């Protein structure tokens, strides 16, 4: 199990400085295995995106642990955690996170700025753009891309450093059926290639691509 969360929970104060809290994620355990695609479905506000950001090492939990290859993420200093996250986790964030001033290829290459490797990343970036069907748009700007193309670009960016873990937050939101299927197929292919892939979505179509499915409701995670 390459990523494991135990006793993980998150509370938020209802008002600044207030004593009343809202439990976004109730204590839960979950693990991700290499070569498998896991899906968490649930309506907006169910806590699934909060859970994903904790698993990604971005949002500090109220309680519990997140371990990546045995290393407790939140026992690390911020710089150490960021370095581990950039090296081992590919994140497909919710919405359009492209930098409009950069080309599609340069957007895909952004992770290499944060975490360098010996081999030149440009060749890998172009290879991924071919894989996701965007080779002809490498020098285009994100404003020239459709919603489906932007999501495919985000997946290529997440896979650039060949991370063993891929976390995708609502990767098919706002896409038509054909584009949603294309995006989910790419994530399925990443799992087939050996990555541990997690998809959180308010849509149920992703379950058809999953090895394991969960639902989330009011911060509670339930195995399907």
Spans of model-derived segments:
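ABC ATPase NBD coupling module
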Residues: 19, 73-90, 192
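Conserved ABC transporter NBD signature motif
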Residues: 64-72
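Helix-to-loop junction immediately C-terminal to a conserved catalytic motif
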Residues: 56
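Catalytic Walker B motif of ABC-type/P-loop ATPase nucleotide-binding domains
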Residues: 166-169
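A short, proline-enriched helix->beta-strand linker immediately N-terminal to the Walker B motif
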Residues: 160-164
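ABC-type ATPase nucleotide-binding domains, specifically the catalytic core motifs of the NBD
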Residues: 13-17, 109-122, 131-132
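Conserved ABC ATPase signature
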Residues: 141-145, 149
